[in-house]
């Protein structure tokens, strides 16, 4: 066995993965997301400080809606209004905030929120999962394909031609 194969065949050192469910306040304006970010920050600090005692925390997953909540669904807001006034861009200010936490704790942070994808359509938002690496960078982003009936998010299938033009039609595009 060569040294590269030996290195990859070694067991992964034990680590902790945390799933955090925070209280998320509904947002009436994009600036209100900051309150939810501060709550997430406090909970991450507390959870990591308690958990890091036994093993390093390498993955933190936030509950769906932790940043943006579900205001658009609760109040049945028009899609364009919600996209223009409420939801984030990935990457953007909010991912930079979370990126600082990922760097601080040398961990991955997994987030789900409503986000615009201006590279696809600037007046639409998607129920988006993204992953921030320990260097604080967004390394993965995906749009939810199957929505709950009350969800107003756009899906790749709603704008199929534009999506395929940008990402292709392979299974990895969806």
Question: What is the predicted role of each segment?
Answer:
Residues 26-35, 87, 154-161:
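Acidic/histidine-rich helix-loop elements
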Residues 45-79, 102, 109-110:
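Active-site beta-strand/loop signature of hydrolases that rely on acidic residues for catalysis
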Residues 12-33, 61, 141-144, 173:
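Active-site-proximal beta-strand elements of phosphoester/diester hydrolases
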Residues 71-83, 120-131:
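Surface-exposed, active-site-proximal loop segments in enzymatic domains
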Residues 81-96, 161-164:
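A short acidic, glycine-rich active-site loop
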């Amino acid at each position: 066995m060569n040294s590269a194969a030996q290195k990859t065949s070694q067991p992964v050192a034990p680590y902790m993965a945390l799933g955090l469910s925070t209280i998320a306040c509904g947002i009436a304006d994009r600036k209100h997301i900051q309150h939810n970010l501060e709550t997430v920050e406090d909970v991450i600090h507390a959870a990591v400080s308690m958990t890091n005692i036994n093993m390093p925390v390498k993955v933190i997953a936030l509950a769906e809606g932790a940043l943006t909540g579900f205001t658009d669904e609760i109040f049945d807001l028009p899609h364009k209004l919600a996209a223009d006034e409420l939801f984030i861009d990935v990457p953007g200010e909010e991912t930079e905030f979370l990126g600082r936490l990922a760097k601080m704790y040398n961990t991955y942070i997994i987030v789900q929120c409503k986000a615009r994808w201006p590279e696809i359509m600037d007046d639409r938002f998607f129920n988006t999962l993204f992953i921030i690496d320990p260097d604080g960078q967004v390394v993965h982003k995906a749009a939810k394909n199957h929505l709950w009936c009350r969800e107003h998010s756009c899906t790749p299938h709603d704008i199929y031609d534009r999506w395929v033009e940008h990402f292709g039609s392979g299974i990895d595009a969806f």
